[in-house]
């Protein structure tokens, strides 16, 4: 008998499909994003150890006043510059994997990824 996943929402199924396709290994760290209508969150995760190495969001004290509870292109620029600052301070020698979660690679998600790529990070 076939296993049923009817208890999961479509976005949860999409997120699980995307995460299954990612290259999760010791030499790759995962950049995971989450967005809501008011905030945008980014984490750098080591899947082998199961820990978050660093994170940035619209709730950080440095950019909270600029964001004002809205997620738009300006907010994404601020969060990406904060994440680049934190990643460059870590001096990463490992490659990165971009985890878009259940979100399509358009709009704000692609703007964030391109901002990281333009700063010299490869994924």
UniProtKB/Swiss-Prot annotation:
GO terms for biological process: translation. InterPro entries: Ribosomal_uL18_bac-type, Ribosomal_uL18_bac/euk. GO terms for cellular component: cytosolic large ribosomal subunit. Keywords: Ribonucleoprotein, Ribosomal protein, RNA-binding, rRNA-binding. One of its GO terms (molecular function) is structural constituent of ribosome. The keyword Nucleotidyltransferase does not apply. Pfam families: Ribosomal_L18p. HAMAP family: Ribosomal_uL18_B (MF_01337_B). This is one of the proteins that bind and probably mediate the attachment of the 5S RNA into the large ribosomal subunit, where it forms part of the central protuberance. Belongs to the universal ribosomal protein uL18 family. Part of the 50S ribosomal subunit; part of the 5S rRNA/L5/L18/L25 subcomplex. Contacts the 5S and 23S rRNAs. This is Large ribosomal subunit protein uL18. It comes from Wolbachia sp. subsp. Drosophila simulans (strain wRi).
